[in-house]
Amino acid sequence: MRGREFPLVLLALVLCQAPRGPAAPVSVGGGTVLAKMYPRGNHWAVGHLMGKKSTGESPYAYEGGNMKEQLREYIRWEDATRNLLSLLEAKGIGSHQPPQWEPLGIRQSTWDSKDGSNFKDMGPRLKVDGLSAPGSQHEGRIPQLN
């Protein structure tokens, strides 16, 4: 034997001597076919329940404790909410109307309301890429496409 083959033969002998058994523990009674397929239980809800927290920390969960203490806690939250609302209304933030936005610039209409057929003369404009703009010498000409 060569030196490289010896560790492989030794590994094969060790693996043959290892006890064979199920990868996951199965109940002694054997159980049904589904119990053998899912030895740790049914996993249909695993993805559905991921990230869910315990309801014990929720203020809305019924703890079965003292009703007077729960009522006091509710009244404290209600008072805190009222105080916050009054502070917001005092600053003017609590109004139900949406904020009035200022226009970005003063916009003037280009339409002459007295003469409904013409646009207002906006003064001379520049020529861009061979096309004439209103107010230029070539105004009114139809550009030719090549």
UniProtKB/Swiss-Prot annotation:
Pfam families: Bombesin. The keyword Signal applies. The modification Methionine amide is found at M50. Residues 1-23 form the signal peptide. Residues 54-146 form a propeptide. It is found in: Secreted; Cytoplasmic vesicle, Secretory vesicle lumen; Cell projection, Neuron projection. Keywords: Amidation, Cell projection, Cleavage on pair of basic residues, Cytoplasmic vesicle, Mast cell degranulation, Secreted, Signal. It comes from the Eukaryota. GO terms for cellular component: extracellular space; neuron projection; secretory granule lumen. The keyword Transport does not apply. Residues 112-128 have a biased composition (Basic and acidic residues). Residues 95-146 are annotated as: Disordered. One of its GO terms (biological process) is psychomotor behavior. GO terms for molecular function: neuropeptide hormone activity. Stimulates the release of gastrin and other gastrointestinal hormones. Contributes to the perception of prurient stimuli and to the transmission of itch signals in the spinal cord that promote scratching behavior. Contributes primarily to nonhistaminergic itch sensation. In one study, shown to act in the amygdala as part of an inhibitory network which inhibits memory specifically related to learned fear. Belongs to the bombesin/neuromedin-B/ranatensin family. This is Gastrin-releasing peptide. It comes from Sus scrofa (Pig). The gene is GRP.
